[in-house]
Structures are given as structure tokens and as C-alpha cells.
């Protein structure tokens, strides 16, 4: 299964609590922090909720 590298490029300051919790659930804490996660429908749904705050790259 493919992996995704997710980077938090925008701050969560001033964002609704649901978006903050979603970013935290993805494993991101600070701006410019990155995580590598499995590509599955649950992760894609979380990414879709906060896509305006993230940069997503597909790993090989």
C-alpha cells in the first residue's frame, strides 16, 4: 500500500477545534512538522477536512 508524507504548512491558530483535533489525530504538532502514514480511506478523509493547512506528497 502507498504511503503519504503529510506536512503541516499553515498554523492551527484561529482554526476551529475540530480542525485542530484532526491535525493532532494525523500526528502533526508544529508548523512544518511531517509524518509518513499509510494511504487509506480514513486518512484521506482526515486530510480532506484540513487540506488547506497541509502539503501532501506520495512516497514511493
From Swiss-Prot:
Organism: Staphylococcus epidermidis (strain ATCC 35984 / DSM 28319 / BCRC 17069 / CCUG 31568 / BM 3577 / RP62A)
Keyword annotations: Ribonucleoprotein, Ribosomal protein
One Pfam family cited in the UniProt record for this chain: Ribosomal_L30
The keyword Cell wall biogenesis/degradation appears for this protein: no
Molecular-function annotations in GO: structural constituent of ribosome
Coiled coil ranges: none
A Gene Ontology cellular-component term: cytosolic large ribosomal subunit
InterPro entries named among the record's database cross-references: Ribo_uL30_ferredoxin-like_sf, Ribosomal_uL30_bac-type, Ribosomal_uL30_ferredoxin-like
Protein name according to UniProt: Large ribosomal subunit protein uL30
Family under the similarity heading: Belongs to the universal ribosomal protein uL30 family.
SUPFAM superfamilies: Ribosomal protein L30p/L7e (SSF55129)
UniProt key word Magnesium: no
Subunit and interaction comment: Part of the 50S ribosomal subunit.
Biological process annotations from GO: translation
